[in-house]
């Protein structure tokens, strides 16, 4: 029983947030901190490369950044049929930012919490995208961008028509249209948030469960834990990249749908 409680306590400790209080309106400080750090890493790397960019023989980092920019720009050109001067940088930022936040999950699960413990911090969850409040924050930003691009494309009157006269073009059915279209609109940010959160939370939990194997006084279990940790980390590289790509891709597609939606 003691071992079970110890295991349960270990898992619970790693799933607890560093927060401002116990009320409903508390803030997850660790999610906020690592989100800012991830964004700062992206800005630092790309701004440094941009300042040192040369038309001559490029450095390896410049080649990497140029490949990333060209790749994202190609995706935006194929999927967003409107002015791309803001959507391209937005897509690049989303992909890199989400990828860096996801990649924090590859750090050994005990390293950052133990480091924080040295400074008197009891709880710390380092993966912002494994926190539903973090992914909802990202998706709410996308939600407002969808509304912005719809209004920019159709005007306020066109925006109202989209959600009151579709799919049934009759004044008496405006409440039905509004209900249907509102659900469709709200489903976009909700699905974005929960898809990213679900995958990253599951990945984080698997790492924690594998780490529990190291607590056993059994050489076979410890050895199996090392093998499983390495195997899952290699597979998880694909997961974190794919989830960043899906979030970025769906954002571009949703913005394109809002911008190019046909009049009814």
UniProtKB/Swiss-Prot annotation:
Pfam families: ATP-synt_A (PF00119). Keywords: ATP synthesis, Cell inner membrane, Cell membrane, CF(0), Hydrogen ion transport, Ion transport, Membrane, Transmembrane, Transmembrane helix, Transport. F-type ATPases have 2 components, CF(1) - the catalytic core - and CF(0) - the membrane proton channel. CF(1) has five subunits: alpha(3), beta(3), gamma(1), delta(1), epsilon(1). CF(0) has three main subunits: a(1), b(2) and c(9-12). The alpha and beta chains form an alternating ring which encloses part of the gamma chain. CF(1) is attached to CF(0) by a central stalk formed by the gamma and epsilon chains, while a peripheral stalk is formed by the delta and b chains. It is a multi-pass membrane protein. It comes from the Bacteria. Disulfide bonds: none annotated. One of its GO terms (cellular component) is proton-transporting ATP synthase complex. Key component of the proton channel; it plays a direct role in the translocation of protons across the membrane. This is ATP synthase subunit a. GO terms for molecular function: proton-transporting ATP synthase activity, rotational mechanism. Belongs to the ATPase A chain family. It is found in: Cell inner membrane. Its main location: membrane. The chain crosses the membrane at residues 27-47, 87-107, 131-151, 172-192, 196-216, 230-250. The lineage of its organism: Bacteria, Pseudomonadati, Pseudomonadota, Gammaproteobacteria, Pasteurellales. NCBIfam families: ATP_synt_6_or_A, PRK05815.1-1. GO terms for biological process: proton motive force-driven plasma membrane ATP synthesis. The gene is atpB.
